[in-house]
Amino acid sequence: MNEELTFEEEMMRLEEIVNTLEKGNLRLEESFNLFKEGVEISKRLEKRLSEVEGKITLLINENEEIDFKEEEKDV
């Protein structure tokens, strides 16, 4: 897939893959290809989540620094 999908779209695709694989009515090669696609999607989703987690951590840390500096001014 060359187009950039949203996080939610990739989650939906991963759910489709899981549901299809759980049915168990595919040939081995088809199952393998779907499994491979699912692993690739999972890696991209994990990377996106890690990036967002890092941004959240930065925002929290920046906010704590601001709060701490404001407390110092009050003293």
Swiss-Prot record:
Group of enzyme by EC: hydrolase
Cellular location(s): Cytoplasm
Catalytic reaction(s) noted: Exonucleolytic cleavage in either 5'- to 3'- or 3'- to 5'-direction to yield nucleoside 5'-phosphates
Disulfide pattern: none
GO-annotated molecular function: exodeoxyribonuclease VII activity
GO cellular component: cytosol; exodeoxyribonuclease VII complex
Gene Ontology process terms (BP): DNA catabolic process
Superkingdom to which the source organism belongs: Bacteria
EC number, as in UniProt: 3.1.11.6
Alphabetic keyword roster: Cytoplasm, Exonuclease, Hydrolase, Nuclease
Pfam families on file: Exonuc_VII_S
UniProt-listed PANTHER family: EXODEOXYRIBONUCLEASE 7 SMALL SUBUNIT
Family statement drawn from the similarity comment of this UniProt entry: Belongs to the XseB family.
Subunit structure: Heterooligomer composed of large and small subunits.
Function: Bidirectionally degrades single-stranded DNA into large acid-insoluble oligonucleotides, which are then degraded further into small acid-soluble oligonucleotides.
Name under which the protein is recorded: Exodeoxyribonuclease 7 small subunit
Organism this protein belongs to: Thermoanaerobacter pseudethanolicus (strain ATCC 33223 / 39E)
Gene it is expressed from: xseB
